[in-house]
Amino acid sequence: MSGGGGDDVVCTGWLRKSPPEKKLRRYAWKKRWFILRSGRMSGDPDVLEYYKNEHSKKPLRIINLNFCEQVDAGLTFNKKELQDSFVFDIKTSERTFYLVAETEADMNKWVQSICQICGFNQAEESTDSLRNLSSASHGPRSSPAEFSSSQHLLRERKSSAPSHSSQPTLFTFEPPMTSHMQPALSTSAPQEYLYLHQCISRRTENSRSASFSQGTRQKSDTAVQKLAQSNGHCINGVSNQVHGFYSLPKPSRHNTEFKDSTYDLPRSLASHGHTKSSLTGSETDNEDVYTFKMPSNTLCREFGDLLVDNMDVPTTPLSAYQIPRTFTLDKNHNAMTVATSGDSAIAPPPRPPKPSQAETPRWGSPQQKPPIGENSRSVAATIPRRNTLPAMDNSRLHRASSCETYEYPTRGSGESASWSAESPGKTAVGRSDSASSDENYVPMNPGSSTLLAMERAGDNSQSAYIPMGPGPHHFDPLGYPSTALPIHRGPSRGSEIQPPPVNRNLKPDRKAKPTPLDLRNNTVIDELPFKSPVTKSWSRINHTFNSSSSQYCRPISTQSITSTDSGDSEENYVPMQNPVSASPVPSGTNSPAPRKSTGSVDYLALDFQPGSPSPHRKPSTSSVTSDEKVDYVQVDKEKTQALQNTMQEWTDVRQSSEPSKGAKL
């Protein structure tokens, strides 16, 4: 090791060195022989050198500790072969060197030696935020097995913290990992360390990561279970839609008609088809095939709360919990019985006129809605489209109209939970070959359905949102049925209804752009060692590394080094600026040269002006010190001759009219 015999060798040993940050995955971590040299006695800079082996004479690289900014000890690394090692880093202005020691004593020895030479103090953020953790967890770590257990725990936080965060964040664990690691921690760490690592905030967060919160979920389950127990066959469509989220009993009736699918429309309501043709003989003969009882008003109100409050349940094709609408129709289209509760003594609305054609996209005059009670609440209901209108009673015809979106009362008719679960577009495709099937298509996205309804309606804002009060049902001018609205709590005025926010990044065909960024961040965390609660950091108070701050922060022995370096850099600085400053002569003549390099540049630039250099040379030389005059003479003699030769060649080529300018010295 003939790398400077007079240097003070502070520390030597084997360390495993990291490749550059961009090559951590492709290149291996090489084991090198490191020597820490102090220039206290010789006046040389403090350096950290590493060699290929102990007997090498030429170092592979010399790390100048004058540019060292920070040292971190006790880093965590997920590389398999380095999980049980002790990692520390040296951050310089050019590169961050990650070094791996075999034992904790070696790491502490290197870190203390480097910090002592550089004059580092422990960072305030490390002492404030990690005072308890550092004393409790970093001290007792004496074996690789214990460090492996803690490092195994630290790997859980890699997706939530950056690789170079200035202040390590306290991490939480998944409940299985916490229970698995609890015995190891309880035997090797103090009690307060266990409290920090076994905090239960992650458990509540894990419960919140489900589709809905506990409070909403319990409320929703209670409402659905009550509704299912009261009237199981009434929620056939809901059991098909939300069977993944709620445990609902299977319907005991109509299994053969619906076949456990929300797109099987009751045959009496098939759109674009004659009612006689859509009804079979067995269905029309039995008067009770499509008749069922309604739940009580209390249960209907709870079910309305479930639909309005719990927005985490997946949306259905019509943005509502849709239950197959069931009616009882006879062969002659003269009766359509709808089973109601005790509140069925309401006056029927006026009978609309019979349409002129059997197959029309829409039909004539609007119909009235029965009055609503004071305490009744409404939800958005969608009734399947019917184009063939038989001769019915007024009260029955009120419920067999085209596919409309309106506020259906909860108490007034007792039919609030009996909604349509079928998308009219799907039904038209499956059961009818009518040419106007596109008119019945309803998008599955709640946001897009609302926008589609508003676009079709034009300026008619009332076609999209219908007020609660009694009034005619609206149809859009193109003959399309108004699309189903998202689930809302029925307000007293239609102007208060607002559609829910739509996250369009959740569409299946949409490619989210942040995905590559997340993957890149994860790979960086996997590749680079990161800080942990046991990490200690040392750095300077002032991180601006100019000449004055370096002399202030460095030890006294290095002040002579910085002064000699500044003198050497001055000589090298003047020749580099000569070619640049030779062209802007007028701006250079007006500057007085307050600095060393500026004065020398002005002096050299004025040599080539005929008649003007002598008046300007005297004030520029008089404004600087005598030591700098010596530098001017030494540099001017060489560089001025070179610049004169260049100018002479330029004048010869251009055939300048002033050939004497290049010959002047």
From Swiss-Prot:
Gene3D superfamilies membership: Pleckstrin-homology domain (PH domain)/Phosphotyrosine-binding domain (PTB)
Family to which the UniProt record says this protein belongs: Belongs to the GAB family.
Subunit structure comment from the entry: Part of a complex composed of EEIG1, TNFRSF11A/RANK, PLCG2, GAB2, TEC and BTK; complex formation increases in the presence of TNFSF11/RANKL. Interacts with HCK. Interacts with SHC1; may mediate interaction with receptors. Interacts with SYK. Interacts with PI-3 kinase. Interacts with GRB2 (via SH3 2 domain). Interacts (phosphorylated) with PTPN11. Interacts with TNFRSF11A (via cytoplasmic domain). Interacts (phosphorylated) with 14-3-3 family proteins SFN, YWHAB, YWHAE, YWHAG, YWHAH, YWHAQ and YWHAZ; prevents interaction with GRB2 and attenuates GAB2 signaling.
The protein's name in its UniProt record: GRB2-associated-binding protein 2
Sites of Phosphotyrosine modification: 263, 290, 441, 632
Chain intervals with Low complexity compositional bias: 412-423
GO molecular function per UniProt: phosphatidylinositol-3,4,5-trisphosphate binding; phosphatidylinositol-3,4-bisphosphate binding; protein domain specific binding; protein phosphatase binding; transmembrane receptor protein tyrosine kinase adaptor activity
Annotated InterPro entries: Gab1-4-like, PH-like_dom_sf, PH_domain
PROSITE patterns (UniProt xref): PH_DOMAIN
Keyword Zinc-finger listed: no
PH domain mapped to chain residues: 8-119
Lineage: Eukaryota, Metazoa, Chordata, Craniata, Vertebrata
Record-annotated membrane-spanning stretches: none
Biological role: Adapter protein which acts downstream of several membrane receptors including cytokine, antigen, hormone, cell matrix and growth factor receptors to regulate multiple signaling pathways. Regulates osteoclast differentiation mediating the TNFRSF11A/RANK signaling. In allergic response, it plays a role in mast cells activation and degranulation through PI-3-kinase regulation. Also involved in the regulation of cell proliferation and hematopoiesis.
Modified residue annotations for Phosphoserine: 2, 135, 142-143, 149-150, 160, 165, 211, 220, 261, 278, 282, 365, 402, 420, 423, 532, 612
Keywords, comma-separated and alphabetical: Cell membrane, Cytoplasm, Membrane, Phosphoprotein
Entry GO CC: cytoplasm; membrane raft; plasma membrane; protein-containing complex
Cell location: Cytoplasm; Cell membrane; Membrane raft
Region (Disordered): 131-183, 340-442, 491-517, 548-631, 646-665
Phosphothreonine modified-residue sites: 262, 275, 284, 328, 382, 388, 405
Post-translational modification: Phosphorylated upon EGF stimulation. Phosphorylated on tyrosine residues by HCK upon IL6 signaling. Phosphorylated on tyrosine residue(s) by the thrombopoietin receptor (TPOR), stem cell factor receptor (SCFR), and T-cell and B-cell antigen receptors, gp130, IL-2R and IL-3R. Phosphorylated upon stimulation of TNFRSF11A/RANK by TNFSF11/RANKL. Dephosphorylated by PTPN11.
Motif (SH3-binding): 348-355, 499-508
